[in-house]
Protein backbone atom coordinates (compact mmCIF):
# COMPACT_ATOMS: atom_id res chain seq x y z
CA UNK A 1 0.00 0.00 0.00
CA UNK A 2 1.64 3.27 -1.00
CA UNK A 3 2.06 5.96 1.59
CA UNK A 4 0.84 9.53 1.24
CA UNK A 5 2.25 12.71 2.69
CA UNK A 6 -0.40 12.49 5.42
CA UNK A 7 1.29 9.33 6.73
CA UNK A 8 4.59 11.11 7.37
CA UNK A 9 3.58 12.65 10.71
CA UNK A 10 2.81 9.22 12.16
CA UNK A 11 6.35 8.04 11.44
CA UNK A 12 8.51 11.12 12.08
CA UNK A 13 7.99 14.47 13.77
CA UNK A 14 10.68 16.01 11.55
CA UNK A 15 8.38 16.08 8.51
CA UNK A 16 6.98 19.42 9.60
CA UNK A 17 6.38 21.09 6.23
CA UNK A 18 4.31 19.99 3.24
CA UNK A 19 7.52 19.67 1.21
CA UNK A 20 9.15 17.36 3.76
CA UNK A 21 5.97 15.28 4.00
CA UNK A 22 5.93 14.85 0.21
CA UNK A 23 9.62 13.94 0.26
CA UNK A 24 9.00 11.37 3.00
CA UNK A 25 6.21 9.71 1.00
CA UNK A 26 8.28 9.71 -2.20
CA UNK A 27 11.32 8.11 -0.56
CA UNK A 28 9.25 5.58 1.40
CA UNK A 29 7.28 4.47 -1.66
CA UNK A 30 10.38 4.19 -3.85
CA UNK A 31 12.17 2.13 -1.22
CA UNK A 32 9.15 -0.11 -0.70
CA UNK A 33 8.89 -0.74 -4.43
CA UNK A 34 12.62 -1.47 -4.68
CA UNK A 35 13.06 -3.68 -1.59
CA UNK A 36 9.56 -4.76 -0.57
CA UNK A 37 10.37 -4.11 3.10
CA UNK A 38 8.06 -1.64 4.85
CA UNK A 39 10.30 -1.20 7.89
CA UNK A 40 13.32 -0.40 5.76
CA UNK A 41 11.27 1.99 3.62
CA UNK A 42 10.16 3.92 6.70
CA UNK A 43 13.70 4.06 8.10
CA UNK A 44 15.11 5.31 4.79
CA UNK A 45 12.42 7.98 4.48
CA UNK A 46 12.98 9.09 8.08
CA UNK A 47 16.71 9.37 7.44
CA UNK A 48 16.28 11.48 4.33
CA UNK A 49 13.83 13.82 6.04
CA UNK A 50 16.12 14.15 9.07
CA UNK A 51 19.00 15.24 6.81
CA UNK A 52 16.80 17.75 4.96
CA UNK A 53 15.18 19.24 8.08
Locate the predicted segments by residue.
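C-terminal alpha-helical interaction appendages
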Residues: 1-53
